[in-house]
């Protein structure tokens, strides 16, 4: 882990030199960009399993930050950055199990992320999705029953229907982390 070192640039040297890295903790650095081609250029990027990119200044991930280059991705945390949309590249990794995109804010603390990712249902291995602390609005997608930990708290304008996972919530097989005042429909059990 090389977090908290005030790195402004992503350490591409790790991938240019074909380092065999499977977990990378770069939290709390202030990184603003990951250069395009970082992951497609390395013959060992396929070994990557876990990224902690929290508390940086990222607003996008390069196109090569995806399941094709990193097919064994297990967990990605990009919380506390500056994304206006959920980065979808990691979601095409067949093994992505944990994905966190909490609290996306600009430099003044304004919430940036309002759009629900349209391809979340195409990620069947995803079991934990944390998207709290944003400004999500009406979600019309059916919430995946594969996700068993779903964190949406601190989204004051959210509106969603959980009827398809309500029985799982009642049975204790689905952990919903939410605020009681949120507009959650289709499952009276959560009120």
Task: List each language-model region with its residue ranges.
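Conserved hydrophobic beta-strand positions in leucine-rich repeat
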Residues: 1-2, 22-26, 48-53, 73-78, ...
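Consensus "Asn ladder" position of solenoid repeat domains
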Residues: 2-5, 26-29, 53-56, 81, ...
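Core solenoid repeat modules with strong leucine/isoleucine-rich periodicity
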Residues: 3, 10, 15, 21-27, ...
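Conserved hydrophobic position(s) of the canonical leucine-rich repeat
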Residues: 7, 21, 31, 48, ...
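Canonical leucine-rich repeat
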Residues: 10, 34-37, 61, 86, ...
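Hydrophobic anchor residues at the C-terminal helix/turn of individual leucine-rich repeat
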Residues: 14-16, 38-42, 65-67, 89-92, ...
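Leucine-rich solenoid repeat scaffolds
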Residues: 76, 129, 137-191
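Beta-strand-rich solenoid/repeat architectures in extracellular/passenger domains
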Residues: 92-93, 107-113
């Amino acid at each position: 882990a090389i977090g908290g070192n005030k790195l402004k640039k992503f350490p591409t040297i790790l991938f240019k030199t074909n380092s065999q890295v499977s977990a990378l903790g770069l939290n709390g650095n202030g990184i603003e960009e990951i250069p395009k081609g970082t992951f497609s250029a390395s013959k060992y990027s396929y070994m990557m399993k876990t990224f902690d990119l929290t508390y940086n200044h990222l607003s996008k991930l390069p196109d090569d930050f995806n399941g094709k280059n990193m097919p064994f991705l297990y967990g990605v945390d990009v919380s506390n950055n500056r994304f206006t949309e959920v980065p979808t590249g990691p979601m095409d990794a067949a093994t992505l199990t944990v994905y966190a995109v909490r609290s996306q804010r600009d430099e003044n603390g304004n919430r940036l992320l309002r759009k629900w990712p349209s391809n979340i249902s195409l990620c069947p291995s995803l079991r934990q999705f944390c998207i709290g602390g944003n400004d999500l609005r009406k979600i019309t997608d059916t919430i995946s029953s594969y996700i068993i930990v779903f964190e949406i708290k601190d989204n004051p304008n959210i509106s969603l229907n959980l009827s398809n996972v309500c029985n799982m919530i009642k049975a204790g097989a689905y952990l919903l982390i939410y605020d009681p005042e949120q507009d959650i429909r289709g499952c009276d059990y959560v009120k």
